[in-house]
Amino acid sequence: MDERSLTFHIGPVWFDGTVCMMVLLTCLIVFFLVYFFTRNLKMKPTGKQNALEWVIDFTRGIVTDNLPRKELNNFHLLAFTLFLFVFVANNIGLITKIVLPSETTLWKSPTADPFVTLTLAFIMITLTHLFGVKKLGFKGYFVNSFLKPYSFMFPMKLIEEFTNLLTLALRLYGNIYAGEVLLTLIANMMNNLGWFSLPLAIPLEMVWIAFSLFIGSIQAFVFVTLSMVYMSHKIEVEE
């Protein structure tokens, strides 16, 4: 796809304006969703409160499945916020497609950009190291993370840190980007073939949107789950 993004710079540093705008919009959507779903809370939840409590229980399950139960309060809010952000970021690009005549894209999923997913993965991997140092002290963290069970595995453990970062980021990026590419190809087919393509293109577009929504949800789950798995490797002492 020959698409370009809005760009701007602050001094010598250039930024992708489309991505910055979509990341900000994603944050606002998450904030207002939580605000809307938490208004007028009741002891007997109904409707929107049930939906929010289901997401809360779902993310609690991710944490307790991968970390000791005593760590639930420390990481549940992180998992909940991360899941909502990645879920919205994955699926926001399915709402519409805005491209200017100059081929400048104004609307897309932020996680369809590799720099966004690499940044998210870098933040999560960095947090695992910080929490490991906080809980075990620097010496305990270093020994637990890189020298156990055998010290000769240190080079492999070091390489593993980089592969964890890359796989966490590129898995998310690849799935979301591929979905948006195919949606764009279907839309281009409709544009090029005209009305004759509608009986085939519209059902195909609807099916692929539904499939992309499913994939986006699964990838949000996978991203949070792997983040908690990597966290457990850093804060749990290996025997």
Swiss-Prot record:
Residues in coiled coil: none
Subcellular location: Cell membrane
Record field: transmembrane: 17-37, 75-95, 113-133, 182-202, 206-226
An annotated GO BP: proton motive force-driven plasma membrane ATP synthesis
GO-annotated cellular components: plasma membrane; proton-transporting ATP synthase complex
Domain of life: Bacteria
Keywords in alphabetical order: ATP synthesis, Cell membrane, CF(0), Hydrogen ion transport, Ion transport, Membrane, Transmembrane, Transmembrane helix, Transport
Protein family membership: Belongs to the ATPase A chain family.
General function of this protein: Key component of the proton channel; it plays a direct role in the translocation of protons across the membrane.
Subunit details: F-type ATPases have 2 components, CF(1) - the catalytic core - and CF(0) - the membrane proton channel. CF(1) has five subunits: alpha(3), beta(3), gamma(1), delta(1), epsilon(1). CF(0) has three main subunits: a(1), b(2) and c(9-12). The alpha and beta chains form an alternating ring which encloses part of the gamma chain. CF(1) is attached to CF(0) by a central stalk formed by the gamma and epsilon chains, while a peripheral stalk is formed by the delta and b chains.
Protein name per its UniProtKB record: ATP synthase subunit a
